[in-house]
UniProtKB/Swiss-Prot annotation:
Lineage: Eukaryota, Viridiplantae, Streptophyta, Embryophyta, Tracheophyta
Entry keywords, A to Z: Endoplasmic reticulum, Glycoprotein, Isoprene biosynthesis, Membrane, NADP, Oxidoreductase, Transmembrane, Transmembrane helix
Region (Catalytic) residue spans: 184-595
Protein function: Catalyzes the synthesis of mevalonate. The specific precursor of all isoprenoid compounds present in plants.
Catalytic activity: (R)-mevalonate + 2 NADP(+) + CoA = (3S)-3-hydroxy-3-methylglutaryl-CoA + 2 NADPH + 2 H(+)
Family: Belongs to the HMG-CoA reductase family.
EC number annotated for this UniProt entry: 1.1.1.34
Linker: annotated segments: 113-183
Family annotation (InterPro entries): HMG_CoA_Rdtase, HMG_CoA_Rdtase_cat_sf, HMG_CoA_Rdtase_CS, HMG_CoA_Rdtase_eu_arc, HMG_CoA_Rdtase_N, HMG_CoA_Rdtase_NAD(P)-bd_sf, HMG_CoA_Rdtase_sub-bd_dom_sf
Membrane topology recorded in Swiss-Prot or TrEMBL: Multi-pass membrane protein
Transmembrane feature ranges: 48-68, 92-112
Subcellular location: Endoplasmic reticulum membrane
Protein's recorded name: 3-hydroxy-3-methylglutaryl-coenzyme A reductase 2
Length: 595
């Protein structure tokens, strides 16, 4: 092999070139050397000279460390908690962190830059190989040598193929791309897909909630590779949910709304809106409404009205926890606490405080009226005011959480079943023998026996908590979704016991539902949305009642209970008559799935 060392600099012949010939131009690296291009040091990016910057951070590190150590010794002597810091201590901590980061990440920058700026003495470097290959692929003859040499065929140098990435065990979905309406939108979409821009900031960037929802939907399609074509986007006022109902929307879900009724309740007729995807539910409830109407209507009474919130506090001993329990249960002290609580709202009024102790932990269940609002935010604000007041009276009290699950919210709990939460309601009706036979297609005795063995004995065998009914949750959920209530509160709102008894010498049927914790409101949350507001308006309970605050929410609770009464009556009759399977096969079976 002929190995020859290349000269440090290319030597160009001094011979005069032809008219059509150009001398071989020096490589760009050589041009930079000829032009005496200055090399940039890494320390040039610093605002101060390197030695001053290093000295500054050295001084800051040791001075701040000395300050913090002295403050630490003082806190130990004074028994001050270490986590309590002043503004000067906070600034010292930040300065210490900054100096440590600099010393670990940037110290010795002058030493490092010597390697960065050190060049190769040989002007021919590795990058010159590409230059040689390009210049050596000339197609014309080398006439400058004074002889005619046949031109060699030009060599075709194919670029190397980039390395293929290793196969992943999980195949990523191919992005589903829909053309954006403008180049600016396309740029924003790509930024979100690549993780350079957060999706939740689209509203701030665009200034339009609807446009942000449209772009966010397109982003989700590209990231997941799944089509969202069936999820509607147009036809919804997204400004109405901004900051209160839903974050980062990409559309809305359509749920059909049916009407059951008229429901004759306390002498008034109500057309009950029910949002559901379960076939036969509206039809069954409608049949129950018909039976109640034909029998003279139903009567409904609100027994209690009070939303609850139960914070958890802890003391050093159980004795101290008991002292606070006696304090808040004292009628004289309660008046003071009620005044503190009531300052948080025009409608929130503290009714009572129920306490429970677990060791040195105290749970205080605040009960208050909340007007026409469901009231969770209202009662939480009032409880916070009381806790701030008690903190001054009991400085050793440690607030664990404003909610200690003794409330109890969105969970089946015996405290709600026994003490009630929200609106406690009982609804009753007497269904005549004729209606039982002609409308419900069953017998009074059969209904009474079925209710005892199914709703009472059967639920007891199952260990049910508040579930002594046939399907109260079905009706509660449907009315809740239609009227903008919190669907998650269907859990405790569906607590119900259904009672049936033969009256009037066994000819007629007395049926009742007792529901101790219906949590509803006619203002706030989803009640202000257009569709839900229309359903509330249909019932005559839209918004707040200015003349009698809270009456609209209580009326809505009675409508819920009356609808449950109708649903229980119809379903129990269908089971008693053996019609349940046939009716569900007719109304609750998808023809597409069965075909």
């Amino acid at each position: 092999m002929d190995v020859r060392r290349r000269s440090e600099k290319p030597v160009y012949p001094s011979k005069v070139f032809g008219a059509d010939e150009k001398p071989l131009k020096p490589h760009n690296n050589q041009q930079q050397e000829d032009n005496n291009t200055l090399l940039i040091d890494a320390s040039d990016a610093l605002p101060l000279p390197l030695y001053l910057t290093n000295g500054l951070f050295f001084t800051m590190f040791f001075s701040v460390m000395y300050f913090l150590l002295s403050r630490w010794r003082e806190k130990i002597r004074n028994s001050t908690p270490l986590h309590v810091v002043t503004l000067s201590e906070l600034g010292a901590i930040v300065s210490l962190i900054a100096s440590v980061i600099y010393l670990l990440g940037f110290f010795g920058i002058g030493f490092v830059q010597t390697f960065v700026s050190r060049g190769n003495n040989d002007s021919w470097d590795e990058n010159d190989e590409e230059f040689l290959l390009k210049e050596d692929s000339r197609c014309g003859p080398a006439t400058t040598l004074g002889c005619a040499i046949p031109a060699p065929p030009a060599r075709q140098i194919s670029p190397m193929a980039p390395p293929q990435p290793a196969m992943s065990m999980v195949e990523k979905p191919s992005p589903l791309i829909t053309p954006a309406s403008s180049e600016e939108d396309e740029e924003i979409i790509n930024s979100v897909v690549q993780g350079k821009f957060p999706s939740y900031s689209l509203v701030i960037q665009l200034g339009d909630v609807s446009a942000a929802a449209s772009l966010r939907k397109e982003v989700m399609q590209r990231i997941t590779g799944k089509s969202l074509e069936g999820l509607p986007l147009e036809g919804f006022t997204y400004e109405s949910i901004l900051g209160q109902c839903c974050e980062m929307p990409i559309g809305y879900v359509q749920i059909p709304v049916g009407i059951a009724g008229p429901l004759l309740l306390n002498g008034k007729e109500f057309s009950v809106p029910m949002a559901t995807t379960e076939g036969c539910l509206v039809a069954s409830t409608n049949r129950g409404c018909k039976a109640i109407y034909a029998s003279g209507g139903a009567t409904c009474i609100v027994l209690r009205d009070g939303m609850t919130r139960a914070p958890c506090v802890r003391f050093g001993t159980a004795k101290r926890a008991a002292e606070l329990k006696f304090f808040v249960e004292d009628p004289i002290k309660f008046e003071t606490l009620a005044n503190v609580f009531n300052q948080s709202s025009r409608f929130g009024r503290l009714q009572r405080i129920q306490c429970a102790i677990a060791g040195k932990n105290l749970y205080m269940r605040f009960v208050c009226s909340t007007g026409d609002a469901m009231g969770m935010n209202m009662v939480s604000k009032g409880v916070q005011n009381v806790l701030d007041y008690l903190q001054n009276e009991y400085p050793d009290m440690d607030v664990i959480g404003i909610s200690g699950n003794f409330c109890s919210d969105k969970k089946p709990a015996a405290v709600n079943w026994i003490e009630g939460r929200g609106k406690s309601v009982v609804c009753e009706a007497i269904i005549t023998e004729e209606v039982v036979k002609k409308v419900l297609k069953t017998e009074v005795a059969a209904l009474v026996e079925l209710n005892m063995l199914k709703n009472l004995t059967g639920s007891a065998m199952a260990g049910a908590l508040g579930g002594f009914n046939a399907h109260a949750s079905n009706i509660v959920s449907a009315v809740f979704i239609a009227t903008g209530q919190d669907p998650a509160q269907n859990i405790e709102s569906s607590h119900c016991i259904t009672m049936m008894e033969a009256v009037n010498d066994g000819k007629d049927l007395h049926i009742s539902v007792t529901m101790p914790s219906i949590e509803v409101g006619t203002v706030g949350g989803g009640t202000q949305l257009a569709s839900q507001s229309a359903c509330l308006n249909l019932l005559g309970v839209k918004g707040a009642n200015r003349e009698a605050p809270g009456s609209n929410a209580r009326l809505l609770a009675t409508v819920v209970a009356g609808s449950v009464l109708a649903g229980e009556l119809s379903l129990m009759s269908a089971i008693s008559a053996g019609q349940l399977v046939n009716s569900h096969m007719k109304y609750n079976r998808s023809t597409k799935a069965s075909s």
